[in-house]
């Protein structure tokens, strides 16, 4: 039986009694955001709205975006990326589990020097896909042109934010390229790999 979204106690400043709130609402108050699903318009709008709201609330405190996503739609992903560049606070990106396709694009969009992957995380990049086979000929041509523009946009961003030459990024985007956390660091997609806490006491 599904338990739904867990709830945790939260006491607002000046209040004596705590109230039970959705765990994500509680974490949002600490400026911690989560992309834990496929990228679509709904989650994109939620994250964009949260980033804008938290910037209005305090434009000096950093934001933290945790990513575990198989990818998703290109335009909603670009909306998240552009908002990350637009807001005043630095946006840390943290890859846990998988950041694939648009997930890796959002990961690379974090503030340079503040992009991190957990030790066993996986990252995958590739070119944007399409539903060509469903489109009539005229729409097919228009969609192919638009897809080419989107590919150029994504490639340019990866080049700019990883420091890799155009030919390397272009070659990688020809197919699905999976990377470990350390490989993603070497590739310039993340800056740091988290160190496992062994639990040893000093």
From Swiss-Prot:
Coiled-coil zones: none
Recorded GO MF terms: ATP-dependent peptidase activity; ATPase binding; serine-type endopeptidase activity
Nucleus found in the keyword field: no
Highest taxon of the lineage: Eukaryota
Active site location: 101 (nucleophile), 126
Chief location category: plastid
Cellular compartment(s): Plastid, Chloroplast stroma
GO CC terms, sorted: chloroplast stroma; endopeptidase Clp complex
Subunit structure: Component of the chloroplastic Clp protease core complex.
PANTHER family assigned: ATP-DEPENDENT CLP PROTEASE PROTEOLYTIC SUBUNIT (PTHR10381), CHLOROPLASTIC ATP-DEPENDENT CLP PROTEASE PROTEOLYTIC SUBUNIT 1 (PTHR10381:SF15)
Functional note: Cleaves peptides in various proteins in a process that requires ATP hydrolysis. Has a chymotrypsin-like activity. Plays a major role in the degradation of misfolded proteins.
The protein's name: ATP-dependent Clp protease proteolytic subunit
């Amino acid at each position: 039986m599904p338990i739904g979204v867990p709830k945790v106690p939260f006491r607002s400043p000046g209040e004596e009694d705590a109230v039970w709130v959705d765990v994500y609402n509680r974490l949002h108050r600490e400026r911690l955001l989560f992309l834990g699903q496929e990228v679509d318009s709904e989650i994109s709008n939620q994250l964009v709205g949260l980033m804008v709201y938290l910037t209005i609330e305090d434009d000096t405190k950093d934001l933290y975006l945790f990513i575990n996503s198989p990818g998703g739609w290109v335009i909603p992903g670009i909306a998240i990326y552009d908002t990350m560049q637009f807001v005043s606070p630095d946006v840390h990106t943290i890859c846990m589990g998988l950041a694939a396709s648009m997930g890796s694009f959002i990961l690379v969009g974090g503030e340079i020097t503040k992009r991190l992957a957990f030790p066993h995380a996986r990252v995958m990049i590739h070119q944007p896909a399409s539903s060509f086979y469903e489109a009539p000929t005229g729409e097919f041509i228009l969609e192919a042109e638009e897809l080419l523009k989107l590919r150029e946009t994504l490639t340019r961003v990866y080049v700019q934010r990883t420091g890799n030459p155009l030919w390397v990024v272009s070659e990688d985007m020809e197919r699905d390229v999976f990377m470990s956390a350390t490989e993603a660091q070497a590739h310039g997609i993340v800056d740091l790999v988290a160190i496992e806490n062994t639990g040893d006491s000093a």
